[in-house]
Design a protein with these regions (language model features):
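Phosphate-rich cofactor/ligand-interacting catalytic cores and adjacent structured alpha/beta frameworks
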Residues: 83-156, 162, 200-230
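Catalytic cofactor-binding cores of redox enzymes
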Residues: 33-36, 44-51, 57, 177-204, ...
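Long, contiguous binding/interaction regions
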Residues: 1, 13-90
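Long amphipathic N-terminal alpha/beta scaffold segment
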Residues: 10, 32, 166-169
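Short beta-strand-to-loop capping motifs
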Residues: 5-13
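Long, hydrophobic/aromatic-enriched structural stretches that serve as scaffold segments
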Residues: 145-199
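Glycine- and acidic
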Residues: 64-66, 123, 177-179
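Alpha-helix N-cap/helix-start motif at coil-to-helix transitions, marked by capping-box chemistry
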Residues: 50, 135, 163-167
Length: 230
């Protein structure tokens, strides 16, 4: 695997505390093996910080014991490694897509002036909502957008993805109304952005910057929806 040696001007125990934190809590930290050596060449152990030894990725027993005994096959370890990497990438992608979606909603309401519509200066023709209502709604919808991406990552046909988005969309609408005290601020965005985020989940990250490819996936998901629902 990849290796790196760093020379650090810091107290060894302090460096070990940082590396242990990364190993235990970073999304792919379980795959890191970061040793800290003192100037005399001796290794700093986790136990010196009052931390338990690392556990095996597969069975939860002592990682050191499993490694020495070669308890698990290379194939098992490779499969687990791929699973950890895939889950980390999927989680990072879902968070980023949700951030983009919420950012779009916030930017849209912030555009000023928008005659007849809610903006930073007034509520236009609306009497039941204002700029802050939209902010509350956008914040409430971020978990939903992330969920849509994760649903897209589950695979299946475009139609199956759309079907899987329906219940989360209904629950998101209820969450929106709780955040806005009953006001419909983003019902249309729940539908359209939900499909968009689901499409992003279905696509490899490298295709996100290709609007034609993204819209093609959205179209495949929404194909026949009008005739089926109406």
């Amino acid at each position: 695997g990849n290796e790196c040696i760093l020379l650090v001007d810091a107290e060894p125990l302090a460096v070990k505390a940082i590396t242990a934190e990364l190993e235990d809590h970073a999304p792919i930290g379980r795959l890191f093996d970061m040793d800290v050596l003192r100037p005399d060449g001796s290794k700093v152990e986790r136990q010196e910080l009052g931390l338990p030894g690392r556990r095996c990725l597969l069975c939860g027993e002592s990682a050191q014991v499993c490694a020495r005994s070669r308890k698990h096959s290379v194939e098992e370890l490779q499969a687990k490694t791929r699973e950890i990497l895939r889950e980390a990438v999927d989680e990072a992608d879902s968070r980023e897509a949700a951030r983009y979606a919420c950012q779009a909603l916030l930017y849209e309401v912030a555009i000023t002036p928008k005659p007849g519509l809610v903006d930073r200066e007034n509520s236009g023709s609306h009497r039941d909502m204002d700029f802050f209502t939209f902010q509350a709604s956008a914040a409430a919808l971020q978990p939903y957008f992330a969920q849509c991406v994760r649903i897209g990552r589950q695979g299946g046909t475009p139609t199956e993805t759309l079907r899987a988005l329906r219940l989360p969309g209904k629950l998101a609408e209820a969450e929106m109304r709780r955040a806005t005290v009953g006001v419909n601020t983003h019902k249309g965005a729940i539908f359209s952005m939900g499909i968009l985020c689901g499409a992003l989940g279905r696509l490899d990250r490298k295709n996100w910057a290709d609007p034609d490819r993204v819209l093609e996936e959205c179209a495949a998901m929404a194909k026949g929806i009008v005739s089926e629902d109406y």
